[in-house]
Amino acid sequence: ISIYKKTDSVYQKVYEYEKTAEFTHAIYGGMLCGHPAAVIGHRKGERNLIAFSWNKAEKKYQAEIIDRDCGPANVFHYMKDGADRLISANREIDEVALYTLS
């Protein structure tokens, strides 16, 4: 999983996740807990659901694992009662999961 930034009409890689994440799925991009983020899952290997965001204090991208070994196929984000929520179709373990994030 890599993040590219467009500078002077050219995309350059600015971040690469340190682990292999085969068969990526479950993509959401938008605000998450008040910050721009991307949520990406993968269905092979470790099969994690991961949130990627920019850490302003450390001036670098960071990855936070939301769930492990779940094999997500799709995610949906919504807000309820002021909390960010993700619904994930964790296909590889035959589960639909609700995550409340803070």
For each predicted feature, which ranges?
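Beta-propeller-forming repeat regions
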Residues: I1-S102
